């Protein structure tokens, strides 16, 4: 493959250049799952821990996984509700893949805090 990636092969988030893509080699559905997503509650500033699932049907482009990992790490100190974060991730992934938002599905499962588990899906 003759594609130059900015994040892949460069340790640390200083190499982050956005969600990177590569030409779809012919797959129909891609699902990415990570349990490394964290953000903070915008009211209490307490940490929230998530499992995120990103699923899309690629047309011309696929997401490069290292750039997704770095992208998700950027939310570490962001104050955001689970529901808003699911929509933000969906919209930014769709833009990177040049898809309509309806072509990307994001599910965030927030780990229990205060005895309540939240799942927000787009």
PLM regions: where:
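N-terminal intrinsically disordered, cationic/polar leader segments
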Residues: 1-122
